[in-house]
Amino acid sequence: MSKEVSVEGEQPPVKDYTDPPPEPLLNFGELRLWSFYRALIAEFVATLLFLYVTIATVIGHKEQNAADQCSGVGLLGIAWAFGGMIFILVYCTAGISGGHINPAVTLGLFLARKVSLIRALLYMVAQCLGAIVGVGIVKGIMKHQYNSLGGGANVVAAGYSKGTALGAEIIGTFVLVYTVFSATDPKRSARDSHVPVLAPLPIGFAVFMVHLATIPITGTGINPARSLGAAVIYNQDKPWDDHWILWVGPFVGALAAAAYHQYILRAAAIKALGSFRSNPSN
């Protein structure tokens, strides 16, 4: 009888999890691995495809409006293009490079010691080069429309101050990077084995939602590679005048999201001091 009671009272086993060890600041061993260069290629190609599809969508929308045709995809469609492409590309590249596709995401993961400094820097280079090539392809395919319709470049819209634009970029990037941390949290993955498969969905949806809020202000940066690619290929004064906002804002937002997730939600600083024991039911 006691045996039956003890069996009935047993709880289903809880999946254990362990945080991966922090990446070393300088991991030169990565430079000898083919998987490292494969990841760089994946980031380059993913960012190229991201910029090609999204900037082509922006230019197509503006062309239809300028020609007094139907309104095209509209701002909602543009937001879906950005969010949908992130969903697709993160799904395709997460197992190869982590699916960053954004220097701000890479910075946030570096600050959380998820990637080494060498990997972070070279990822950013690959992302920026991919963005430039992707926008260049758009210009090559639709040169007249590209040059006459703003080139998909991020600028501070009329009626908004640079301070407002900076704040919008900080908050928008915070939402994105915070979502990345939450969707890829190893503790969440340990509880539910299907979470890693679904991780691209909330990340893409976060990009979609942030675009809805920020397109009227800056055209939505939250990705310095996206902003740089369009600015380099369009190469006009206004995008360059506002360009610093599209680096400072996303990087500050990424830093804030990394600090919030690691030191508030995960209590990393307190755990390191040995004065806090996390509740396994959390």
Swiss-Prot record:
Pfam families: MIP. It is found in: Cell membrane. The keyword Cell membrane applies. Induction: Slightly induced by salt (NaCl). Accumulates in response to osmotic (mannitol) and cold treatments. A motif (NPA 2) lies at residues 223-225. Residues 1-21 are annotated as: Disordered. The chain crosses the membrane at residues 39-59, 72-92, 121-141, 163-183, 197-217, 245-265. GO terms for cellular component: plasma membrane. PANTHER family: AQUAPORIN OR AQUAGLYCEROPORIN RELATED. Water channel required to facilitate the transport of water across cell membrane; mercury-insensitive. Contributes to the tolerance to multiple abiotic stresses including salt (NaCl), cold and water deprivation, by modulating cytosolic K(+)/Na(+) ratio, maintaining osmotic balance, and reducing membrane injury (e.g. oxidative injury). Also regulates the expression of abscisic acid (ABA)- biosynthetic and -responsive genes during dehydration and salt stresses. This is Aquaporin PIP2-7. It comes from Musa acuminata (Banana). The lineage of its organism: Eukaryota, Viridiplantae, Streptophyta, Embryophyta, Tracheophyta.
